[in-house]
Design a protein with these regions (language model features):
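Low-complexity, intrinsically disordered extramembrane tails and loops of integral membrane proteins
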Residues: 1-16, 113-116, 256, 260-261, ...
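Exposed alpha-helical structural elements
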Residues: 89, 93, 110, 258, ...
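Membrane-cytosol interface motif
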Residues: 97-117, 241-263
Length: 301
């Protein structure tokens, strides 16, 4: 294998690619640590169902209360896990969420030209949708079945290399695992502003009242915020290895030199030291090591 991997990770290196199969154990751990949250969710939906049916009908519907929690909580976990098969709508959702737009005719032509310049015979998946993000950084991302490319990439000489790297993510489990993990964490991220504001208010000595305290108890118990935070460094370790794998894929498409130059001229200058990186959510490895690995591909021919 060309160049050693960044050793600052506890995940394994396998012959099929850096960390390719590690997502299985990570996802199972992510689900397992959410079991207490799932139990709290079941209990909460059970009590709320009894309360609402009591108010509406004059008596609690125990039959509905015994069934509905399993439908709601089970549906949530099934929805998250379904992304491992088909991350339906993930690309459009993120594109809308960050303000990406449809490409102009000129941008669409540039994308087709860059893609057609790659040897695509062995490529199994291509993005079905293209979005453009009006930002100055030279960057791109693939989410679901969509690729989102920053506008300035279209004016650069590195577009084919950037696309080749993103194809590496698309033609592996990266995109689907990322979507599934994000869905598992969606309740935590959705409620994070509320939880943070409440914590800050309490630290400042504000009296929030018993009712708000009960609401926040339910929110905290159902969101899985602590578990999501615990899993962050583990997922980041996996992603650092997957960035190497996507670089390898781009090298396999003949873009090793171009991608190395892209990193050397546009990315490495912005790297900063990350203390105890295995304890952080830093998802990209040091750029210098990525450049070294890509150039080792060239030396091997």
């Amino acid at each position: 294998m060309p160049a050693d991997l960044d050793p600052r990770t506890w995940l394994s290196f396998e012959t099929r690619g850096p960390g390719e199969r590690d997502w299985v154990k990570l996802y199972l751990i992510a689900v397992a640590v959410l079991i207490p949250t799932a139990i709290f969710q079941l209990f909460t939906v059970f009590l709320l169902t009894l309360l609402f049916t009591l108010i509406a009908n004059g008596h609690g519907d125990s039959g509905l209360a015994n069934v509905l929690p399993w439908i709601v909580v089970g549906g949530y976990f099934a929805w998250a896990t379904s992304a491992l098969i088909v991350p339906l709508g993930a690309g459009r959702y993120l594109a809308d969420g960050i303000g990406a737009r449809r490409p102009t005719a000129e941008e669409a032509d540039a994308y087709r030209d860059a893609t057609s310049s790659l040897p695509l015979d062995g490529v199994k998946r291509l993005p079905k949708s293209l979005y453009v993000l009006d930002r100055h950084e030279l960057n791109a991302a693939v989410v679901g079945d969509a690729v989102i490319i920053n506008r300035t990439v279209f004016d650069s000489e590195y577009m084919a290399a950037v696309i080749a790297h993103e194809l590496g993510h698309l033609n592996s489990m990266d995109v689907r695992v990322s979507c599934a993990a994000n869905r598992l964490a969606s309740l935590a991220r959705l409620t994070e502003p509320m939880r943070t504001q409440t914590t800050e208010a309490r630290r400042s000595g504000q009296q929030l009242g018993c009712l708000w305290g009960l609401v926040m108890l339910i929110v905290r118990g159902c969101s899985g915020g602590l578990q999501t935070t615990m899993m962050g460094p583990a997922w980041a370790s996996w992603w650092r290895l997957r960035e190497y794998a996507a670089d390898d894929y781009a090298a396999g498409l003949g873009q090793a030199e171009e991608l190395a130059r892209f990193f050397d001229e546009n990315v490495v200058l912005y790297d900063v030291p990350i203390r105890f990186v295995w304890m952080t959510t830093q998802s990209h490895p040091p750029t210098a090591l990525r450049i070294e690995r890509l150039r080792a591909h060239l030396e091997r021919g």
